[in-house]
Each structure stands twice: as C-alpha cells, then as structure tokens.
Amino acid sequence: MKNNEVHDIKIAVLATVFNRKDVTLRGLQSFYTSVSEMPDSYHFEIYLVDDGCTDGTGDAVMASYPEVNVIKSKGGLYWGGGMNEAWKAASKEYDYDYYIWLNDDAELYPSALKSIFEVKDNDVIVSGVFEDNEHHISYGGKTEKKVLLPPGSKEEVFYMNGNLVLIPRKIFNKLGYIDSWFIHGGGDYDYGMRAKENEFRIVLTNDFVGMTDRHDEKSFYNKNYPLFKRMKMLYSKKNNPAIAFKLYYKHRSLIEAIKIFALRNIKTIFPKH
C-alpha cells in the first residue's frame, strides 16, 4: 500500500436518551450536518439507547434516521448505564478505531467533528468545548478548582465533561467501559481521571464545537422545597452523595471524600437560596 493512501476510519457514536424527542432529533440533525463536513474516509455508526422513553423518542429516531442502531431498554439506566449499553453493543459489533460520547442535547456546529479529530492522538482523549446561548463556556473541561477552560487551553484538564468526547481504541482497550457505580453523574469525571492515572492525556478542542446550556441547578439545594423533599431528591438514584464520595475517595483522598459527602448534606439541610 502506498504511503499516501487514505485508510478508512470507523467510529462508533454512543448516545442514551430519555423523553426529549424534539431535543434528540435536533441533536442528531446537527450531528449529521457535522458528518457531512468530514472526509469520506471517516465512517460513523450511531448506537443510541432508548432508556424506556414514553414519548416515542426511539421510534421517532428510527423513522427519521433508520441507519441509527436504536437499542430499547426498560428504563432506569440513566446516563452511565445507557452509555455502557450503547458501548457494549458497539464493541461487540466491530473493533472501532474511535468511540464518541454524544449527549443528545448537544447542538453541534458543522465544524464540530473536524475540531475533535484535528487534535486526535492514540494517547489522548479529546473533549469538545461548548458554549451557552450567551456565548459563555458551558462544558468541556475544568481545572482542579472546577474552573471551565476555554477552547485551545493548554492547562491541565482535571475534570472532563462527557458532552462530546473522542476516545481512541487504545484507551478503550485499557480502561474499558464507564464505571457502573456512576449511574448518572460522575462517570465522565471518573473516566477522565482514570485516563490520566494511566498516563493518557485529556485535551480540549481549539474551537467551540456547539451550543448547550449549563445544567447546574441542584433542586435539593432549593429552600423553597420542604426538607423531606430536598433529602429525598438528594438521596435519589441520580444524586446520592455516595456517588461523589466514591469519586473523591477513588481519585483524591478519604478526607476529601468525607468533606464532599458532608457538604452535600449540610447544604441540603441548610440551603442558602
């Protein structure tokens, strides 16, 4: 084979969705627009988990995008479980060169995929940097003090957001799937930390890859709800402070894990807002 011949690159795109049909369809439309900007040698296959949707999201996806592999579940997988179901289905189907995590609410710019692949490397996870509708950084990567980093930043990424992430086969073969303990939140942070602990790097795209608003509001810190309701929300499957405890214990220290666990409870019991 000649050195200038182009090799086909096969990429599995992983997504999980729950009851936001219109958002999902817009997200997929923006994804395929970005695909159209890529060279013909790049081949994308989407594996999308319908996590027990009752609004017909999965059926709408199959009708609009029959090429998407829709995997229906009974529900209750949340983000981490749903992404792992998609990932397992993809890895059983083919030994892909890359895997992409894609949030269905990510409205990608046409240049998004070009942006993540222009900084690709076999020893690197690429996290796409997003902006909100006021053009402030919303997702991508954070410093150790949880400050969001701008596109192209060379500062070390400590916390990686999972909105649009490119993972090479080499790293997947080393790290495997998302830790099943992190059923919803924390799975992206944990995966990035595991990568760094295995001497891989996390880099950010040089440009914004799309638009998505922050989802920082924690209802269990809202003093307008009665205490019993706040505590119920805090100890729900998605928000249980034991999840954050494990993340900090696993990657930081027991002291920091206890601190974050205690703070979550204190701020819920004595909310400021």
Regions inferred by a protein language model and the residue ranges of each:
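Conserved donor NDP-sugar-binding/catalytic core segment of glycosyltransferases
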Residues: 107-139
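A conserved acidic beta->alpha catalytic loop
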Residues: 50-59
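Short, well-formed alpha-helical segments that are part of the catalytic scaffolds
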Residues: 20-35
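A recurrent flexible, glycine/aromatic-enriched loop bordering the glycosyltransferase active site
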Residues: 147-167
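A short, conserved alpha-helix in the catalytic core of glycosyltransferases
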Residues: 165, 171-176, 181-208
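Non-catalytic, C-terminal membrane-associated alpha-helical segments of glycosyltransferases
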Residues: 217-273
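Glycine-rich, basic loop-to-helix element that forms the pyrophosphate-binding segment
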Residues: 73-91
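Short beta-strand-to-loop acidic/aromatic patch adjacent to the donor-nucleotide binding site
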Residues: 95-107
